[in-house]
Each structure stands twice: as structure tokens, then as C-alpha cells.
Amino acid sequence: MKYAIRNTMLAAALAGSMGAASADSIPGMRGHDHTGVTVPDMQQAVEFFTEVVGCKKAMSFGPFADDKGTFMQDLLGVDPKAVIEEITLVRCGHGSNIELFKYTAPDQKDLTPRNSDIGGFHIAFYVDDIAAAKAYLDGKGVKTRMGPLPVTEGPAAGQTILYFQAPWGLQLEAISYPNGMAYEKDAETVLWSPKNPEK
């Protein structure tokens, strides 16, 4: 009980000393730094992102584990006996980084969520010429879906999209909007874009 009261008082004192936080932003938030993805085969993943997509490997480190305690669970919300065998970060042009994880865990599930599943996601790359991107991916034997599909109506009009997949099923997208999108005419907030990284 004393421990809980002491921690509550400490938290209140710290909050008071830091001043009022902005109600609409994490204090000091600058932008999206990276997206983390767990992969089944690190070598395959690094080769795909560097040799097919065109990203550059920045660094690798690991392993991380805790044989005796709950560090992995406490820090990452995974099984206490989970092991991160390796972490590799890649940089992909003018955009945030991708952090690749190779995990083992007693309760690990081997499934890739679809875009319609809760927790499903995809990573999109801006390209200057989406038809050329499609031809390139086809030439590399990458599985692509329908498209390139131009969006001609609504706020996203002006973009063209093409979904494709990594060899292990990760959903990816190529997107292009060389003349911008319709919403930009009247928008108070314009989305950040790798084609104009300074904006």
C-alpha cells in the first residue's frame, strides 16, 4: 500500500513539474520514425527489402531474451520466454524506416493478417511511375494484385495504387499521385509525401 501511495505521489509531482501537456499530441512528437514487422526468415526479408524494393540496410543487433524473468513480457507484451534473435533496420528512400524482427516464442502464431483483419496493415511506397513499378515487380516474380488502379472520384482522386506481397505474405502497396489528390485544394492539413519531403 505504501508503495502504491508513494508512486502515485511521485507521478503527481512529476506531472506538476512538467507543466500541462498538449491535449492533442504526444509531447515532442515529430513524426513517424519506423514500422516494426516480425518476419519468418530474416535473410529473406532483408534481401527482399534491399534487392527488390530498393531499401538500404542500416544496422542489425540482437539477440534479446530473459531466461529467468519477465523482461520480455514487461517491455514488449510478449511471452516471457520469447527471444528476439535479430533486429534489422532498413531505410527506404524519403520515408520512415522499417524495423524487421526475427522472433521465437512458445506461443508464436504463424499467420499473416489480411487487410480486412483487425490488426491487419500494409506498408505503402510512393513511386514516380506506377506502370513501371508494376512491370518491374512482375519481372522480379513478385505477386501483384489488380491494377494499377486509378482513383478518379472523391478526395483521393488523382492517386493510382497497386498492391503487392512480400514472399512471406506481408501486404505492400505502390502508390503514385504526380499531380496531387483532389482533397489538397481545400485541405487545412495536407498529408506528408515522400515526393515533397520538406513539406
What is the predicted function of each stretch?
Residues 1-9:
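Bacterial N-terminal signal peptides that target proteins for export
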Residues 17-20:
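N-terminal signal peptide c-region/cleavage motif recognized by signal peptidases
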Residues 22-28, 32-40, 59-60, 86-102, 111-137, 160-165, ...:
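Vicinal oxygen chelate
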Residues 23-25, 109-112:
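Short beta-strand/turn micro-motifs at beta-sheet edges
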Residues 27, 38-94, 132, 139, ...:
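Core segments of cupin and vicinal oxygen chelate
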Residues 65, 105, 178-180:
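A short acidic/small-residue loop/turn micro-motif
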Residues 103-106, 189:
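Short, flexible, mixed-charge acidic loops at enzyme active sites
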